[in-house]
Amino acid sequence: MGSLASERKVVGWAARDATGHLSPYSYTLRNTGPEDVVVKVLYCGICHTDIHQAKNHLGASKYPMVPGHEVVGEVVEVGPEVAKYGVGDVVGVGVIVGCCRECSPCKANVEQYCNKKIWSYNDVYTDGRPTQGGFASTMVVDQKFVVKIPAGLAPEQAAPLLCAGVTVYSPLKHFGLTNPGLRGGILGLGGVGHMGVKVAKAMGHHVTVISSSSKKRAEAMDHLGADAYLVSSDAAAMAAAADSLDYIIDTVPVHHPLEPYLALLKLDGKLVLLGVIGEPLSFVSPMVMLGRKAITGSFIGSIDETAEVLQFCVDKGLTSQIEVVKMGYVNEALERLERNDVRYRFVVDVAGSNVEAEAAAADAASN
């Protein structure tokens, strides 16, 4: 079991201000408790939300900030009351590391909707210390917010499933959209969208990818297995596809009109918003009234759903398409992600990186 150190110094890569530039940062992990798991970080995926947070797009960033919420690591120590995990287990940590455990969402095991949830970074833990994420060598996490990575799933492949994977799986399950034969749309083909295509296809759905241009058509259909591809600026094609979809999973993280996509939905169709957008979205009410259509949202998934989607991907043979990078490349990776220059998810090889040495190399390369 090992004796848990009350405090320990670690090095992560942190943003110091709204430029979002990351550099090495030494800090002390929070005190460990009886139900805590100490995780040596192996890999951490890069999510578009990491950009929003590092650059203070949402207006609530606190610095220094170590991002990263798609964390896969190895358990190196456990508290005396930890029963679910042992040293050597490969585990995952996602967006949430704390909740009140008393509210209705917590009692319903959908703790991601708890109003007192604690984010894995850019938040304050119950002891008053800031939480820091997975772009670091080590994390301390309550066992409730840790999931086992099942056998048959490579750790680097598992990382994006802890956010992108469960983010598309959860609404499909919750809204009863898992039956084979449904016709679904995936709006946006980034890290979340590409997993949306894969998960929906594995459920037996007819999947249409909707994008602003035709440049991803071959990838969507030939590589990811989509059944159809719609260019949203092609008025004739959009009109021909009206009233054809049971649901649309909207993964676009920037402001965009909703009405063109509402027109694609059948009677009782659902438009599920997943992208984090800081500006109001608008539509005219008849677009939903005349087809009894619903605009709704979903936020990541519960710990139980995270475990489910990991096993679902193992059972269905699904993997995320990733580009593995070292920590010294993380700033370039964030810049490339911001301009959509990745297919489809960056994953940082944290354990294989020397954060201090790679920082010096990155600084030398920029001079």
UniProtKB/Swiss-Prot annotation:
GO biological process terms, alphabetically, are: lignin biosynthetic process
Repressor listed as a keyword? no
Gene Ontology MF terms in the entry: cinnamyl-alcohol dehydrogenase activity; coniferyl-alcohol dehydrogenase activity; zinc ion binding
Q: Does the keyword Oxidoreductase apply?
A: yes
Q: What is this enzyme's catalytic activity, as reactions?
A: (E)-cinnamyl alcohol + NADP(+) = (E)-cinnamaldehyde + NADPH + H(+); (E)-coniferol + NADP(+) = (E)-coniferaldehyde + NADPH + H(+); (E)-sinapyl alcohol + NADP(+) = (E)-sinapaldehyde + NADPH + H(+); (E)-4-coumaroyl alcohol + NADP(+) = (E)-4-coumaraldehyde + NADPH + H(+)
Identify the enzyme class.
oxidoreductase
| Entry-linked PANTHER family | ALDEHYDE REDUCTASE (PTHR42683)
Q: Report what the protein is called.
A: Probable cinnamyl alcohol dehydrogenase
Q: Which organism is this protein's natural source?
A: Zea mays (Maize)
Q: Name the gene behind this protein.
A: CAD
